[in-house]
Amino acid sequence: MKLQLIIPFSFLISYVSAHTIFMKLQSGGTLYNTSYAIRTPTYDGPINDVTTEYVACNGGPNPTTPSSNIINVVAGSTVNAIWRHTLDSTPANDATYVLDPSHLGPVMAYMKKVTDATTDVGYGPGWFKISEQGLNVATQGWATTDLINNAGVQSITIPSCIANGQYLLRAELIALHSAGGSQGAQLYMECAQINVSGGTGTSTPSTVSFPGAYGQSDPGILINIYQTLTTYTIPGPTPFVCGAAQSTAKSSSTSTAKPTSTSTLSTSTVTKTSSSAVASGTGTAAIYAQCGGQGWTGATVCASGSKCVVSSAFYSQCLPS
């Protein structure tokens, strides 16, 4: 059975050019230097397997560099996570300096209370979601598009009711342009090391584990986005809100939230063209899905009408033959 997909033209010409990294944090009016108190990789690739430990703070195929720094953050304040295509990308040297516009999906943030943010491994239990934005059903607009239009600034409000102390702050986005095939969703995340002060400590959030919070077949992970969607279920638990009943259940998103920053970036109009793809079966990767790369454990045989094309040591993709 064939699935009719609408593939953005921009994706056809730049399918390998638009990974991304959370590489700076702004707090209390201070924009810290690249990689300051953030475990950043030098390579901007994704994590595709949600069952690995690397889904917490990156690593594995994208080795991260430890940081001995911690950023002070006031509970109840808003911090800004800054995303860039690479650690060196700027508007002057990179046309897709945040993320390629074809990489559509949700944007989220999590926190984890730790004893020492500089040494905690990140993976395991203790994570709670504090913000999310997915699909605006009315406009069919995605959170990643808003992130690009906001110059890569993800605004995150730190809950005022949590306990003081050190935390890992996990900023994440998921690119769903290849999510119709097994392990096709591309997860991008880094962890910042922060120290929270001014919190009331009146609430203890319910938590989830990374890995564990996401499943490879979750409806927000395995999905064909090239259709009109009436709903989209953002992966993971519902965000923690001070004073609200707590739950770790997933919920459908019809998000209309916008970033709080007023920074904007003009983007060109995306032209769509019709195409078709074969749904992936056992051992077969769909057209436009990943088919290889360092650490890749999914299908390496492409669906009929496509071939596996190597773009780097870390990423290969099924493209029309």
Swiss-Prot record:
One of its GO terms (molecular function) is metal ion binding. SMART domains: fCBD. Cu(2+) binds at H19, H103, Y188. Residues 1-18 form the signal peptide. Its EC number is 1.14.99.56. PROSITE patterns: CBM1_1, CBM1_2. Keywords: Carbohydrate metabolism, Cellulose degradation, Copper, Disulfide bond, Glycoprotein, Metal-binding, Monooxygenase, Oxidoreductase, Polysaccharide degradation, Secreted, Signal. GO terms for cellular component: extracellular region. It is found in: Secreted. Disulfide bonds join C57-C191, C161-C242. Lignocellulose is the most abundant polymeric composite on Earth and is a recalcitrant but promising renewable substrate for industrial biotechnology applications. Together with cellobiose dehydrogenases (CDHs) an enzymatic system capable of oxidative cellulose cleavage is formed, which increases the efficiency of cellulases and put LPMOs at focus of biofuel research. GO terms for biological process: cellulose catabolic process. InterPro entries: AA9, AA9_LPMO, CBD_sf, Cellulose-bd_dom_fun. It catalyses: [(1->4)-beta-D-glucosyl]n+m + reduced acceptor + O2 = 4-dehydro-beta-D-glucosyl-[(1->4)-beta-D-glucosyl]n-1 + [(1->4)-beta-D-glucosyl]m + acceptor + H2O. Residues 283-319 form the CBM1 domain. Its main location: secreted. It comes from the Eukaryota. Binds 1 copper ion per subunit. Its cofactor is Cu(2+). O2 binds at H177, Q186. Induction: Expression is increased 30-fold in cellulose-inducible conditions (in Avicel- and wheat bran-containing complex medium). It holds the Pfam family CBM_1. Belongs to the polysaccharide monooxygenase AA9 family. Has a modular structure: an endo-beta-1,4-glucanase catalytic module at the N-terminus, a linker rich in serines and threonines, and a C-terminal carbohydrate-binding module (CBM). Both linker and CBM domains are essential for binding to and subsequent oxidative degradation of polysaccharide substrate. Major lytic polysaccharide monooxygenase (LPMO) that depolymerizes crystalline and amorphous polysaccharides via the oxidation of scissile alpha- or beta-(1-4)-glycosidic bonds, yielding C1 and C4 oxidation products. Catalysis by LPMOs requires the reduction of the active-site copper from Cu(II) to Cu(I) by a reducing agent and H(2)O(2) or O(2) as a cosubstrate. This is AA9 family lytic polysaccharide monooxygenase C. It comes from Botryotinia fuckeliana (strain B05.10) (Noble rot fungus). The gene is AA9C.
